Amino acid sequence: MDFSYSSYEKLISLLKQYNYSITDYNNYKKYEKSVILRHDIDFSIKDSYKFSLFEESLGIKSNYFVLLSTGFYNPMEKRVRKILRDMHNRGFTIGLHFDTTAYDNTDLNKPIQSEKHILEEILEAPVNLIAFHRPAPTVLANNLKFPGLINVYSKEFFHDCKYCSDSRFFWRDNPYELITSQKYDRLQILTHAFCWAESDRCPAHVYKSFISQASWERYKYLTENIRNPEEFISEEEARKLWLNK
């Protein structure tokens, strides 16, 4: 299975063909066979927003998890807030993607509740889901519970459901085969919109393009925040930096 939109569309078609109901973490038990589609926003809000529009064109809704402590995007930025609210208003579920390594304290509940509150302020809506970012084995083993939040790495969703992920452009289980095998009535499929595009791409190229794009985005933000930026750097110079020329 590659990382093209057409491959994802085939995934959705197979799920429907084999009678899986596409649902969420609150309602999956209502169905004889159910699948939860999850997306962790590790790198790019834009890619995730584009992917949500693609999913909407397929007639489905899924679950997106926002990483507040990332250095790659700012959930508080006006444009990002607008995107997240739009996704929520269009029926996509937004949850908290929490990085345990961002905090020194062993009691995680306080920073988790703080980030939950921030995300609720951004969305202007309640948040009741948490997915850990690159969870340590101890986090997975302890079946952690937090007030007001469903831990999607709890035993209920990580062991009782068949879990499948595309982490680092690599499927540890082929999702097509999981579906067609008919061995599992409960699936949780994690994908990262950053990996997906209209056509399949070399992972190294994706990461290099992502790094290169950052220089152009910095220039655009610069033009919005200082007067006469061309006194220091022209658009042509910025474009050359972006294109690595």
Specify the residue positions occupied by each region the protein language model found.
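Terminal accessory/targeting
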Residues: 1-63, 67-79, 85-90, 101, ...
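Short HxH-centered metal-ligating active-site micro-motif
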Residues: 93
